[in-house]
Amino acid sequence: MSLTDKEIMDGVLAEFSNLAAIPRKSNHEEAVSNFLKERALSFGCKVVQDEKFNLIIDKDAAKGCEAWPRVIIQGHMDMVCVAAEGVQYDPLTSPIKIINDGEFLRADGTSLGADDGIGVAAAMYLLQQDFNHGPIRAIFTVDEEQGMTGAKALDAKYLLDAKYLINCDSEAFDVLTLSSAGSVNVDAERRITWHKPEHRSAYKFVVKDLHGGHSGEAINCGYANAVKIIAQAINSIMKKTEIELASISSLKARNVIPSEAEFVFTSPLSNVKVFDVVVAKIIDYLKAAYGNVEKNFTVTCVPCELPERVMSEEDASSIVDFINLSMTGVLKMSQVEEGLVELSANIGPVVTKENAVEISVFPRSAVDALTREIANIYIQLGKRCGIRVVSGEPAPGWPANPDSQLKHVVLETFKEQNGFDMKAKSIHAGLECSYFYAKNPNLDIISIGPNNIDIHSPNERLELKTLVPHVKLIKGVIEKLDK
């Protein structure tokens, strides 16, 4: 059956509008899962909803295509829910108000949720169409944005009887994603012995307005890590005078390069100008080491209220040594794909709590052995510094498949349909594909998507001219997967 561009556009946007009407914050997907289940049943598909509210939707092969291998189309139902300043928005009750200006689809003051609502909408639309295809399975997962717990919990049996998986959670229409990085949460803790401050002057040292960014996608941009910078500052001050450290903090998520950090300390010195030398030294260092990419940072040290408690010199030295000696940033580049980071680590957040200082480190690699290796290095470093370090369960990596038939079919079909080449690359960030690969290493997996810009922000917008070609690409690829 031949479909016009308008039919495809209207059909997919209608499916997306259904999703936008249902609040679907991560870990609150029951309503959207129930809606999609009933909708898929209404057009004749078989549906399984697991205890996590993941959906497994099966469509029988078209007549004459029963012997073709099964193809999975996959997306996630949850979305990142954020609103612009001043916008009244409750992620648990408020629908997304869609604005279509003919060029972009966006929301009125909130994130749009095209990540990954548009992937789910495209799959739902294709499940209703008549064309040559083998058995199709749509898998819609929960909680991709916060923990990938849906993909992690998915029963492997839904992956073992398929040959191909098309993930629809990428954001660039002309880019085919071949692999993604795994990761592991490394958590360090120093138990603190508190005492009353002996010094009567207190100061707050702040580094802020560094660039920051995603600790996977932006790790090779060379941005400064604010946590590492303040550890240098503490060392510099310790060389000039005796101090008592009261707190150290940087509160961004572990998958964000810290753009700001601060520490509070006491000193026998009552003249803040003494510390201006350290401020100037840190500024000079940032300009020399990061001046090409860090343009707007500020470094300050100002008097503050005397803290009620400070940590021992041993505790402070242990924490600062661990941060200073921790390897962060790009640790290894790929020897196979030019420009691809193979191993990295990000330090932050750092939190001073009631009885401890907690430090988070987040290593990434598509090679699971490297992720485990760097986690073990942090554990050994912690022992040297008197810091308790534990490593969580690693999220697996998804390595590129050099023999991928699906990759060649996608690249060929894209060129035929669009008249120019699609780029194929790996990313140094996480995708649910990693868990699917771990459950079935023989599954041929790729990831694609239309142009979705400024995701996870109120400026998120979907470029409409890439939507129909994206849907046509999925359909065209499936029509060729006869063996």
Could you describe each region identified by the protein language model?
Residues 77-79, 111, 139-147, 169-173, ...:
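Acidic, glycine-rich active-site loops and adjacent beta-strand->loop/helix elements
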Residues 2-104:
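Acidic/His- and Gly-rich active-site-bordering loop/insert found
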Residues 218, 223-227, 231-248, 392, ...:
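Active-site-adjacent substrate-binding region
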